[in-house]
């Protein structure tokens, strides 16, 4: 009900429910409102891969918590195929050595994502972007792929301070102050 009311109050013409977390909320929303909605096929990794444009993006992604080797990091978070990875601990360059490969892969993913988004026939105006529990990383990188502004409407937003300088518009139903003392 909260989500539907926010969409109505802000007169948002496009409503997207992010994949997995948005499946059931989309079904419930459609029981209340006949307005067309989109089950938006995404994941944080897919959005990040497509949205990276420069070294600052690479550094931001690298700053996120990850417990794995450099090779796993390159494969899992930056989308590099194993045949493009030749890790040498001796050169000490880490991710810098793979900058061009990361950005080249991002360009390919970006074009694919833009084709997918174009197929959705997005109307002029904002997009309400539902995610259940998130920081806003997926939304930030998806925002780079379309001209419409995204308004994140989350059930719970994690670590809002982590995204405070990223100009991501998010409103949460359940605030982090309300999570203090919860299980």
Regions found by a protein language model. Name each.
Residues 1-183:
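Long, low-complexity, Lys/Arg-enriched
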């Amino acid at each position: 009900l909260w989500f539907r009311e926010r969409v109505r109050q802000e007169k948002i013409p496009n409503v997207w429910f992010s994949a997995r977390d948005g499946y059931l909320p989309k079904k419930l929303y459609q029981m209340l409102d006949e307005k067309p909605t989109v089950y938006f096929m995404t994941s944080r990794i897919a959005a990040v891969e497509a949205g990276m444009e420069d070294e600052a993006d690479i550094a931001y992604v690298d700053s996120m918590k990850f417990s794995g080797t450099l090779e796993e990091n390159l494969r899992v978070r930056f989308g590099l195929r194993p045949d493009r990875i030749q890790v040498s601990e001796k050169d000490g360059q880490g991710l810098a050595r793979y900058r061009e490969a990361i950005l080249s892969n991002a360009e390919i993913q970006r074009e694919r994502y833009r084709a997918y988004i174009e197929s959705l026939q997005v109307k002029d105006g904002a997009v309400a972007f539902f995610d259940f529990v998130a920081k806003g990383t997926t939304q930030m990188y998806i925002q780079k792929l379309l001209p419409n502004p995204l308004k994140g409407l989350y059930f719970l937003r994690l670590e809002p301070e982590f995204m405070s300088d990223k100009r991501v518009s998010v409103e949460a139903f359940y605030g982090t102050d309300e999570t203090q003392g919860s299980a």
